[in-house]
Curated annotation (Swiss-Prot):
Record-listed Phosphoserine modification sites: S67, S1167, S1229, S1494
Function: Clathrin is the major protein of the polyhedral coat of coated pits and vesicles. Two different adapter protein complexes link the clathrin lattice either to the plasma membrane or to the trans-Golgi network. Acts as a component of the TACC3/ch-TOG/clathrin complex proposed to contribute to stabilization of kinetochore fibers of the mitotic spindle by acting as inter-microtubule bridge. The TACC3/ch-TOG/clathrin complex is required for the maintenance of kinetochore fiber tension. Plays a role in early autophagosome formation.
Assembly mode: Clathrin triskelions, composed of 3 heavy chains and 3 light chains, are the basic subunits of the clathrin coat. In the presence of light chains, hub assembly is influenced by both the pH and the concentration of calcium. Interacts with HIP1. Interacts with DENND1A, DENND1B and DENND1C. Interacts with OCRL. Interacts with ERBB2. Interacts with FKBP6. Interacts with CKAP5 and TACC3 forming the TACC3/ch-TOG/clathrin complex located at spindle inter-microtubules bridges; the complex implicates clathrin triskelions; TACC3 and CLTC are proposed to form a composite microtubule interaction surface.
InterPro entries on file: ARM-type_fold, CHCR, Clathrin_H-chain/VPS_repeat, Clathrin_H-chain_linker_core, Clathrin_H-chain_N, Clathrin_H-chain_propeller_rpt, Clathrin_heavy_chain, TPR-like_helical_dom_sf
PROSITE patterns: CHCR
Keywords: Acetylation, Autophagy, Cell cycle, Cell division, Coated pit, Cytoplasm, Cytoplasmic vesicle, Cytoskeleton, Membrane, Mitosis, Phosphoprotein, Repeat
Protein name: Clathrin heavy chain 1
Length: 1675
């Protein structure tokens, strides 16, 4: 049996199988912050990628194009932290958003997620914590200790509260890896350096401690060996015992001298420390004691990153091959392993208790029994309570404690046991029952309540039954927790909590007999019964039939409760509930009419029998409800006339339900019955329903009863909303007839619907005492003239005054007009005007009077108003008109009066006097009217002056339009008169702008010449001069030069630039020259005129540096480099040195460039200038000057110049320059080109650059300087990336020996790498195969085996190929190679060793064939090796086919223990062939897997008797007894025949054998057979047979034995019968006792119940009786 292992080892996935490049599986490119994600940085082609592998979905890796130095995934969510240089960013991959970013001042050398939202950042100097939340920046936690200087940081850990921080690093010292740690306390702000390689924090609660301790575990491999330390950090919490320090040795195998710890994780679930070393060993330690539990190697490659594995509470890691591995505690095995393998039962017990692990059952049971036997019951109780998985918490344990009597004054062992269990957690079902039974007997119910609240007891039906006898409410709690529905509902009912029954039944899906339950509740409390009934029907589907529920109510005559219930149950008003609605109303109309009235009033129901209910309502005196339900008009008319018995408001609403004809009939009946009593109701009905009944019908109804009062009130209620003219007119009529004059006034004033003409005529005819209604109508509808005539002719003049004074003063003008029309006296009119005093429109009054040519009538009144200070324009307008008509100095009035309306008066004057119209319009700025008057009357001078003074651009724009036929005479007047007269600059400015806006350049020039050139006030005005020149540029270019020369006060630069933009280059040049702006002048010559000769002459004439600079720049652009450089020198201007240098480089003017750069260096010591000067000196071959320059102080980029010289093959100059800057790499390259190889090697050594070494090396190879080339090559080959190029360079030129010599020399280098060993092996395979084997045996572990494999195969080095396949674990290929090339490659030991490791089992059979062909004598040895994995059936079939079974007999014997049919049959055949019957019998006895019958049939014909005996034996084994016995009889095997007959248990067969013995006269055999087949033979048959053959003597022993057995049986039967009779006699003597107390059913009620009806609360009630199937124990 294989040894049990305490760990479970699992490979989760292989990263290479997911497409991850093996080169990217390493500490610097792969991170794993938790067991959720693995993050790898890869480069695919030229694109950098980050690959994220979700461990829950590893087959779908996420690839993102991200270029970063490092990437770490959040431990729980798809959030990634990226680092590029000093920039840190946090991204949410799912949201595709950046969460946070920060730029560090120092490089981050290591970082790690220490929690779900915090990243730790480690720089060379300090450690920071950076929170993912909010906007916070990284917070510095502590400075790094000097002991970690120069270390590679490999981990950073914190404790759970982040109060202790640990930084871990490693470094190489004295040929070993030394670990350094810095432990930092956040609270104390102090650090402690510690030597250690791997560490972790853990929270551990010691036995007896109230709080957890913070433990710090670290492992170290020092010079003295390995140690694991476990200590408590900080001060222990109050009340805690300090954790004792632990320091245990860590074992490292002798072959792992350089091994050291690399990772540590602590399982919180199992309190186990997982320690992993660099060589792939796993160590498990108990956290509490430090004991080593297990150690083994789990990986041949280094596991470089680990994390806790949450699913198994173990550790997960990745090794350099890309395997993702996990190790965890095997919970089923670890305790047995510690007990049996480690022989540490104390540790096994401790871990089993502490971590609740199985496997220590026997230990616990043994310890418990021992303590119990010693009488140490308290300790035994602790052991039983603490045993893992509750293995000792059994009824047997409780019975044992119960059997121990309590000592006086001490707690009983049972209670001690229960006390410990209660402290630890919940009791199970049996424990709860056994604890509660004595507690309840002692009356300590409060303890039970306390335990239930603390959830210490497992509730069950039995416990509820136990508690119910004491407290039903508490029992209810138990039943609820135990989920016993029938008992719960029973308790709810008994405790009066009926409101909970339905809710609970629904919750648990239990359905009791609801009606029966309701009856029982109703007996106890009708109110609770009502509440319960409502709960039964509150859902969409009632739990019980409502009719049955109502019957229950009615059984107890509970009308009120039944009503309440039905009101709630029928609230949805369903059609199916009609009979119930009728029943509800009927019971209330008969017993409680008011309640029925209220129900009907709420209109809850609509599906009851309305006719039946109507009759009942009328009988109950509910006339209103009866009307609601009547449908016959006769019934309605009979009831509706009794309005004193009806609610008026309701009655009005009731009419809304009647048809139009029925309503009118009812109204007529009501008025006929009692008009005085019913008039008001009729009016209300008419008012509300007039639209439906038609207003005309209602008017006719009231008029038919001559009820003007009713008509007035009816129409009064609708007149305010009606649009019917007839309604309004009838209302006015009714109001007049009822004397409601005020209402007549109101309706005449407010209504807009009546016919005014009809009303006016009616009011005239009505001859009312008060004429105000007529006045209102005439005023509103413009009948004022008729009104005045009517009143004046009827001598009602006082109403005229009332009208204009009180009703509408604004109508005075019309009234005055009317009075004038009836020739009323002027004095009356004047007095009337004076009385009203301005509450009317003066304009209208003037218009009325003016129409009748009586305007002067108003002069006194107007003057009086003006004298009073009236500013009303209408008054002044009227007065102006009178003055104009009377020619009373009108112009003065028009100029001085500020109140009249200019437009009105101007319009009045246009035909009378245009000049006065202009005055009026000008005063009011009536622009358009004034322009029209001036244009029509040719007043252009006045218009031009007005426009200049007006200063309105829009107005100017309107008159200067081209479409204006009067534009030209107007412009002439503006130029000649208006502008000449003005002195206001603004007027001039607006006028000029208007001409510009109107695009009149020629007219503008004419205007400006008048202003500027004619010595006016504005001659020296700068803007006007500018404008004149600009306008000339635009309109008449021939005048521009004249204006430039004549004018002096203009903006020269601006004008010049405008001239340039208009291509007037000569004019621009003239302006610049006139004002001495020489730089601009020469720029015009260069850029616009394009004449460099004129520019050169102009520059010589003015001789200004700026001018020379401009010219030089132009010459440079034209390619005149020499002339440009001369001009720059004359300008003493080095500013354009870059352009000059570029131009000189292009044209090759190096001598001139030297002069220019020497001038420029004097002005500005620019680095570029000095750099170019050096290059120019080199180009002119002035090496002495160059050397002198570079040896002096300078700012030149000498390296850059050297590279340029090198590129242009100026190697002498380059040599000087590289030597000056000590660039030995480039110096070496230069020396190579100069042929100085030794000096080049010395330079390369100083440069120590791979590129330089390569260049010099290749040059030396080309120069056949192989010694120097090898010196260079040894510095190249250590770089794996460069090796291939170097090898190809040698090989392409055929220098194989030199290349091999160089690589052999390189193997001893300290930095020798796999590529060197690999390439040398390949070279050996090609050119020196004899050295290949030795090289591989020495260095196979350091070569790239796949690459060398291909080379060896190509070179046909089969032995070496097999060796490599073996080392590379490609065993299949190794075997195939040996079989394909046995002469060179096959070795017996090696073949047998490798063949067991192959993956393809088919190779076994090829190997068998190979051995059979080439090594047949060794075939059995091979088969022994192959047998564990060989298909023996197939092998046997093969050997049978090739007829070589005897050859492999040893193999067949060795594998026969598998009981394989083919093997067994083959061996049996061999044994038969060899006539080895003993071996055959042994084989068939030991191995039964073969065709028994076939073998038996074959053997029964064999010539040897022993084989025939075996055939009989086989027939017997297959229940072919007769055949077997017959065969034995045939071969005289009497003993076998008797034995087989006995074993057959066949009486007939045994008797036949007896007969045969007698026939053959074998009497001794007959006697022997009687005893052999004793149990099968019938004594009578034997007696008869013996008597017949006269052999009684031979049968007598048999008969004696038979007689003995029969007598013994008879004696036993006799004794048994006697005993039975005695027992029956004793039973009959006992009296029969009646009246024995019968057991009550267990679920019967436990409280006293009064006598009940047969179906009360007795035993037959389903809710409280014996549990029904489906709800009790019978489930």
């Amino acid at each position: 049996m294989a040894q049990i292992l305490p760990i479970r080892f699992q490979e989760h996935l292989q990263l290479q199988n997911l497409g991850i490049n093996p080169a990217n599986i390493g500490f610097s490119t792969l991170t794993m912050e938790s067991d959720k994600f693995i993050c790898i940085r890869e480069k695919v082609g030229e694109q950098a990628q980050v690959v994220i592998i979700d461990m829950n979905d590893p087959s779908n890796p996420i690839r993102r194009p991200i270029s970063a130095d490092s990437a770490i995934m959040n431990p729980a969510s798809k959030v990634i932290a990226l680092k590029a240089g000093k920039t840190l960013q946090i991204f949410n991959i799912e949201m595709k958003s950046k969460m946070k970013a920060h730029t560090m001042t120092d490089d981050v050398t290591f970082w790690k997620w220490i929690s779900l939202n915090t990243v730790a950042l480690v720089t060379d100097n300090a450690v920071y914590h950076w929170s993912m939340e909010g906007e916070s920046q990284p917070v510095k936690m502590f400075d790094r200790h000097s002991s970690l200087a120069g270390c590679q940081i490999i981990n950073y850990r914190t404790d759970a509260k982040q109060k202790w921080l640990l930084l871990t690093g490693i470094s190489a010292q004295q040929n070993r890896v030394v670990g350094a740690m810095q432990l930092y306390s956040v609270d104390r702000k102090v650090s402690q350096p510690i030597e250690g390689h791997a560490a972790s924090f853990a929270q551990f609660k010691m036995e007896g401690n109230a709080e957890e301790s913070t433990l710090f575990c670290f492992a170290v491999r020092g010079q003295a060996g390995g140690k694991l330390h476990i200590i408590e950090v900080g001060t222990p919490p109050t009340g805690n015992q300090p954790f004792p320090k632990k320091a245990v040795d860590v074992f490292f195998p002798p072959e792992a001298q350089n091994d050291f710890p690399v990772a540590m994780q602590i399982s919180e679930k199992h309190d186990v420390v997982f320690l992993i070393t660099k060589y792939g060993y796993i160590h498990l330690y108990d956290l509490e004691t430090g004991t080593c539990i297990y150690m083994n190697r789990i990986s041949g490659e280094t596991i470089f990153v680990t994390a806790p594995h949450e699913a198994t509470a173990g550790i997960i890691g990745v090794n350099r091959k890309g395997q993702v591995l996990s190790v965890c505690v095997e919970e089923e095995n670890i305790i047995p392993y510690i007990t049996n393998v480690l022989q540490n039962p104390d540790l096994a017990l401790r871990m089993a208790v502490r971590n609740n692990l199985a496997g220590a059952e026997e230990l616990f049971a043994r310890k418990f029994n021992a303590l119990f036997a010693q009488g140490n019951y308290s300790e035994a109780a602790k052991v039983a309570a603490n045993a893992p998985k509750g293995i000792l918490r059994t009824p047997d344990t409780i019975r044992r404690f119960q059997s121990v009597p309590a000592q006086p004054g001490q707690t009983s062992p049972l209670l001690q046991y229960f006390g410990i269990l209660l402290d630890q957690g919940q009791l199970n079902k049996y424990e709860s029952l056994e604890l509660c039974r004595p507690v309840l007997q002692q009356g300590r119910k409060q303890l039970l309540e306390k335990w239930l609240k603390e959830d210490k007891l497992e509730c069950s039906e039995e416990l509820g039954d136990l508690v119910k006898s004491v407290d039903p409410t508490l029992a209810l709690s138990v039943y609820l927790r135990a989920n016993v529905p029938n008992k719960v509902i029973q308790c709810f009912a008994e405790t009066g909590q009926v409101q909970k029954i339905v809710l609970y039944a629904k919750k648990v899906g239990y359905t009791p007999d609801w009606i029966f339950l309701l009856r029982n509740v109703m007996r106890i409390s009708p109110d609770q019964g009502q509440q319960f009934a409502q709960m039964l029907v509150q859902d969409e589907e009632p739990l019980a039939d409502i009719t049955q529920i109502v019957d229950v109510f009615m059984e107890y005559n509970l009308i009120q409760q039944c009503t309440a219930f039905l009101l709630d149950a029928l609230k949805n008003n369903r059609p199916s509930e009609g009979p119930l609605q009728t029943r509800l109303l009927e019971m209330n109309l008969m017993h409680a009419p008011q309640v029925a009235d209220a129900i009907l009033g709420n209109q809850m129901f609509t599906h009851y029998d309305r006719a039946h209910i109507a009759q009942l309502c009328e009988k109950a005196g509910l006339l209103q409800r009866a009307l609601e339900h009547f449908t016959d008009l006769y019934d309605i008319k009979r009831a509706v006339v009794h309005t004193h018995l009806l609610n008026p408001e309701w009655l009005v609403n009731y009419f809304g339900s009647l048809s139009v004809e029925d309503s009118l009939e009812c109204l007529r009946a009501m008025l006929s019955a009692n008009i005085r009593q019913n008039l008001q109701i009729c009016v209300q009905v008419a008012s509300k329903y007039h639209e439906q009944l038609s207003t005309q019908s209602l008017i006719e109804l009231f008029e038919s009863f001559k009820s003007f009062e009713g008509l007035f009130y009816f129409l009064g209620s609708i007149v305010n909303f009606s649009q019917d003219p007839d309604v309004h007119f009838k209302y006015i009529q009714a109001a007049c007839k009822t004397g409601q004059i005020k209402e007549v006034e109101r309706i005449c004033r407010e209504s807009n619907c009546y016919d005014p003409e009809r009303v006016k005529n009616f009011l005239k005819e009505a001859k009312l005492t008060d004429q105000l209604p007529l006045i209102i109508v005439c005023d509103r509808f413009d009948f004022v003239h008729d009104l005045v005539l009517y009143l004046y002719r009827n001598n009602l003049q006082k109403y005229i005054e009332i009208y204009v004074q009180k009703v509408n003063p604004s109508r005075l003008p019309v009234v005055i007009g009317g009075l004038l029309d009836v020739d009323c006296s002027e004095d009356v009119i004047k007095n009337l005007i004076l009385v009203v005093r301005g509450q009317f429109s003066t304009d209208e009054l003037v218009a009325e009077v003016e129409k009748r040519n009586r305007l002067k009538l108003l002069l006194p009144w107007l003057e009086a108003r003006i004298h009073e200070g009236c500013e009303e324009p209408a008054t002044h307008n009227a007065l102006a008109k009178i003055y104009i008509d009377s020619n009373n100095n009108p112009e003065r009035f028009l100029r001085e009066n500020p109140y009249y309306d200019s437009r009105v008066v101007g319009k009045y004057c246009e035909k009378r006097d245009p000049h006065l119209a202009c005055v009026a319009y000008e005063r009011g700025q009536c622009d358009l009217e004034l322009i029209n008057v001036c244009n029509e009357n040719s007043l252009f001078k006045s218009l031009s002056r007005y426009l200049v003074r007006r200063k309105d651009p829009e107005l100017w724009g309107s008159v200067l339009l081209e479409s204006n036929p009067y534009r030209r005479p107007l412009i002439d007047q503006v130029v000649q008169t208006a502008l000449s007269e003005t002195q206001d600059p603004e007027e001039v400015s607006v006028t000029v702008k208007a001409f510009m806006t109107a695009d009149l350049p020629n007219e503008l020039i004419e205007l400006l010449e008048k202003i500027v050139l004619d010595n006016s006030v504005f001659s020296e005005h700068r803007n006007l001069q500018n404008l004149l020149i600009l306008t000339a540029i635009k309109a008449d270019r021939t005048r521009v030069m004249e204006y430039i020369n004549r004018l002096d006060n203009y903006d020269a630069p601006d004008i010049a630039n405008i001239a340039i933009s208009n291509e007037l280059f000569e004019e621009a040049f003239a302006i610049f020259r006139k004002f001495d702006v020489n730089t601009s002048a020469v720029q015009v010559l260069i850029e616009h005129i394009g004449n460099l000769d004129r520019a050169y002459e102009f520059a010589e004439r003015c001789n200004e540096p700026a001018v020379w600079s401009q010219l030089a720049k132009a010459q440079l652009q034209k390619g005149m480099v020499k002339e440009a450089i001369d001009s720059y020198i004359k300008a003493d201007d080095p500013s354009s040195y870059m352009e000059v240098v570029q131009a000189a480089n292009t044209s090759g003017n190096w001598e001139e460039l030297v002069k220019y750069l020497q001038m420029a260096r004097k002005k500005a010591r620019e680095s570029y200038v000095e750099t170019e000067l050096i290059f120019a000196l080199a180009k002119t071959n002035r090496l002495a000057e160059l050397e002198e320059f570079i040896n002096g102080p300078n700012n030149a980029h000498i390296q850059q110049v050297g590279d340029r010289c090198y590129d242009e093959k100026m190697y002498d100059a380059a040599k000087l320059l590289y030597n000056n800057v000590s660039n030995f790499g480039r110096l070496a390259s230069t020396l190579v080109h100069l042929g100085e190889y030794q000096a080049a090697v010395d330079g390369a050594r100083k440069a120590n650059s791979t590129r330089t070494w390569k260049e010099v090396c290749f040059a030396c190879v080309d120069g056949k300087e192989f010694r120097l080339a090898q010196m260079c090559g040894l510095h190249i080959v250590v770089h794996a990336d460069e090796l291939e190029e170097l090898i190809n360079y040698y090989q392409d030129r055929g220098y194989f020996e030199e290349l091999i010599t160089m690589l052999e020399a390189a193997l001893g280098l300290e930095r020798a790498h796999m590529g060197m060993f690999t390439e040398l092996a390949i070279l050996y395979s090609k050119f020196k195969p004899q050295k290949m084997r030795e090289h591989l045996e020495l260095f196979w572990s350091r070569v790239n085996i796949p690459k060398v494999l291909r080379a060896a195969e190509q070179a046909h080095l089969w032995a070496e190929l097999v060796f490599l396949y073996d080392k590379y674990e490609e065993y299949d290929n190794a075997i195939i190679t040996m079989m394909n090339h046995p002469t060179d490659a096959w070795k017996e030991g090696q073949f047998k060793d490798i063949i067991t490791k192959v993956a393809n089992v088919e190779l076994y059979y090829r190997a068998i064939q190979f051995y059979l062909e080439f090594k047949p004598l060794l075939l059995n040895d091979l088969l022994m090796v192959l047998s564990p994995r060989l298909d023996h059936t197939r092998a046997v079939n093969y050997f049978s086919k090739v007829k070589q079974l005897p050859l492999v007999k040893p193999y067949l014997r060795s594998v026969q223990n598998h009981n394989n049919k083919s093997v067994n049959e083959s061996l049996n055949n061999l044994f038969i062939t060899e006539e080895d019957y003993q071996a055959l019998r042994t084989s068939i006895d030991a191995y039964d897997n073969f065709d028994n019958i076939s073998l038996a049939q074959r053997l029964e014909k064999h010539e040897l008797i022993e084989f025939r005996r075996i055939a009989a034996y086989l027939f017997k084994g297959n229940n072919r007894w007769k055949q077997s016995v017959e065969l034995c009889k045939k071969d005289s095997l009497y003993k076998d025949a008797m034995q087989y007959a006995s074993e057959s248990k066949d009486t007939e067969l045994a008797e036949e054998l007896l007969q045969w013995f007698l026939q053959e006269e074998k009497r001794e055999c007959f006697g022997a057979c009687l005893f052999t087949c004793y149990d099968l033979l019938r004594p009578d048959v034997v007696l008869e047979t013996a008597w017949r053959h006269n052999i009684m003597d031979f049968a007598m022993p048999y008969f004696i034995q038979v007689m003995k057995e029969y007598l013994t049986k008879v004696d036993k039967l006799d004794a048994s019968e006697s005993l039975r009779k005695e027992e029956e006699q004793a039973t009959e003597t006992q009296p029969i006792v009646y009246g024995q107390p019968q057991l009550m059913l267990t679920a019967g009620p436990s409280v006293a119940v009064p006598p009940q009806a047969p179906f009360g609360y007795g035993y037959t009630a389903p809710a409280y009786g014996q549990p029904q199937p489906g709800f009790g124990y019978s489930m």
